[in-house]
Amino acid sequence: MIRVILTDIEGTTSSISFVHDVLFPYASEHLPEFIRANHHTLPAVAEQLVRVAEISGTDRKDIDGLINVLQEWIAEDRKEGALKALQGMVWEQGYHSGELKGHIYPDAADYLKRWHDRGLRLFVYSSGSVKAQKLIFGHSNEGDFTVFFSGYFDTAVGGKKESQSYRNILAELGVDAGTVLFLSDVEEELRAAEEAGLKTAWLVREGELPDTARVVARDFSEVDALLRKR
């Protein structure tokens, strides 16, 4: 019986275009100014710039060089933790100022509430930082959804296409793998979760449905129908 739902964000609860067409451009535009204004005064910014310098081989004192590296990583959609942390700081400013609103599909908003009210525990697992996850759900077009989630996971537990990452999550949650349903729009992530023993549902919101033995759903209402059968 499913007792825990672990969900991805991009393409699952939220539009991929929101991340790529809104969040990434916003970070790319505002990151240089943010770093120049805060690299001396905010320890959290300085700490992440040290990591960027170590990974890229750039001189820590070369602020313009570090900014260029970060812009390249944004363009490449790199999953570097330092980039995600800095993006999260920039997005936080945007959310608090009201310039940004997180996106949640109406069906996802509806069923996340229903599942929470039915006693299911809800968790997020995304390549975006935990801070960024909380911002998307805390300042969304559907209101504050952080009240419905019991916790958040990012790449600190490992990459989403690695089965060990899901074992790490299970260890933190202290639950049996068979009681967890993982929702994602990426087949490689589903495969990794299945290798760790989790149940899965493949969200395919647009385009043709794949020819697969995996459980496939168009939206969260179809996921709910599957839940009621289990």
Swiss-Prot record:
Binds 1 Mg(2+) ion per subunit. Its EC number is 3.1.3.77. Monomer. It catalyses: 5-methylsulfanyl-2,3-dioxopentyl phosphate + H2O = 1,2-dihydroxy-5-(methylsulfanyl)pent-1-en-3-one + phosphate. Its cofactor is Mg(2+). It holds the Pfam family Hydrolase. One of its GO terms (biological process) is L-methionine salvage from methylthioadenosine. Pathway: Amino-acid biosynthesis; L-methionine biosynthesis via salvage pathway; L-methionine from S-methyl-5-thio-alpha-D-ribose 1-phosphate: step 3/6; Amino-acid biosynthesis; L-methionine biosynthesis via salvage pathway; L-methionine from S-methyl-5-thio-alpha-D-ribose 1-phosphate: step 4/6. It comes from the Bacteria. This is Enolase-phosphatase E1. Signal peptide: none annotated.
